[in-house]
Amino acid sequence: MKETQNAREKIKQLLHILIPIFITQAGLSLITFLDTVMSGKVSPADLAGVAIGSSLWTPVYTGLAGILMAVTPIVAQLLGAEKKQKIPFTVLQAVYVAALLSIAVLVIGYAAVDLILGRLNLDIHVHQIAKHFLGFLSLGIFPLFVYTVLRSFIDSLGKTRVTMMITLSSLPINFVLNYVFIFGKFGMPALGGVGAGLASALTYWCICIISFFIIHKNAPFSEYGIFLTMYKFSWKACKNLLKIGLPIGFAVFFETSIFAAVTLLMSHFHTVTIASHQAAMNFASLLYMLPLSVSMALTIVVGFEAGAARFKDARSYSLIGIMMAIGFSLFTAACILLFREQIAGMYTSDPDVLRLTQHFLIYALFFQLSDAVAAPIQGALRGYKDVNYTLAAAFVSYWVIGLPVGYMVGTFTSLGAFGYWIGLIAGLAAGAVGLFFRLAKLQKRYSQKQHI
């Protein structure tokens, strides 16, 4: 990354960082997509088992990965402040934290997974597939968490194309391994959906090893000498990392787990309603990738400028990123409005589900408009290391406003299932307003400091 002089240079640098992040996020989601689709070719039970296992794992992973993503703003600010000598120590401490988190997940997971699956009252065959899928997947938890740290380090230097290429290389690896273990090719036993867990675990080891060699051998990463000096574990550094990482992790967890909670609360509705809701929610999740990518890019560039005490530039980046996300959101809103029948048709051919999905997509339209404001502001605030407010905003907007309002409207009015979407939209909109005022207040404070 480099210092920019005008808005045109800022837009160019932001896009240079943003586009690879977007492709990376899409690539990571495709791994889960491949697991689910290829497992579904074996049997409905395999599809259900993998889908349930993935739905349990995703909130846990995204929340804990959020903790490790604290590396991005920390390293970006060290880079901006020209304190490069502190970066290897910071990255290695994050790897130690990744190892501790891996151990914690393995211990708790092995103790609790049977209990959790038992509470879901699943068919015994589906229960066993989900259990063993998660068991095999757990073999890749440590490399996945270490990769998250290494990816955050690479991204913080503005070299997001590198992580993009690593992620894209993982897709054919995952596809081939799925083919081998799910269907039993090249002398391997046919494990069905369970094999998708093993394939994903081995894929995580591959991308971790690839990242390690890139950091060790290729400039500019090799210039930092990561892993050349094995620093001792530091509780102080760990606490500093967790001080920023825990609020990020919990905020991400609150965001991802709310959708699972809504789906569970909607379980008493007709199958057609649930299927339509899931289709619209899946499409909304796909649209969320862009504001999420803008958010991650803003964390990098705002952190870089804030670390260099160029607060005016940090503010400009924030505004550009927010406007970029809103512009894309308005475009996708128009597409939903005009092509909602075709969008619904990608998910189903059932006429009842098709009709109802189109109605849900109208709510998805307003949902993603709120996301376009909230997500980039969260990223900008994290660039300033202002993470506690984003945690509070995520909790209040989803769990204090969104879910209760959704439950009340969905249960006690004629809107039914649509009420849950109204609740989520109301909560997210309220959170976006709160985040906007927080960012404005923070930037005003830093602007005053710059003029002193």
Swiss-Prot record:
Localization:
Cell membrane
Q: Can you tell me where the transmembrane regions are?
A: 14-34, 56-76, 97-117, 129-149, 164-184, 195-215, 244-264, 284-304, 319-339, 360-380, 392-412, 417-437
Q: Which GO terms describe its biological process?
A: monoatomic ion transport; response to antibiotic
Q: Keywords on this record? A: Antiport, Cell membrane, Ion transport, Membrane, Transmembrane, Transmembrane helix, Transport
GO cellular component labels: membrane; plasma membrane
How does the entry describe its membrane topology? Multi-pass membrane protein
| GO MF annotation terms | antiporter activity; xenobiotic transmembrane transporter activity
> Which InterPro entries does the record cross-reference, listed alphabetically?
MATE_fam (IPR002528), MATE_MdtK (IPR050222), MdtK-like (IPR048279)
What the protein does comes down to: Multidrug efflux pump.
Q: Which family does it belong to?
A: Belongs to the multi antimicrobial extrusion (MATE) (TC 2.A.66.1) family.
Q: What is this protein called?
A: Probable multidrug resistance protein NorM
What gene codes for this chain? norM
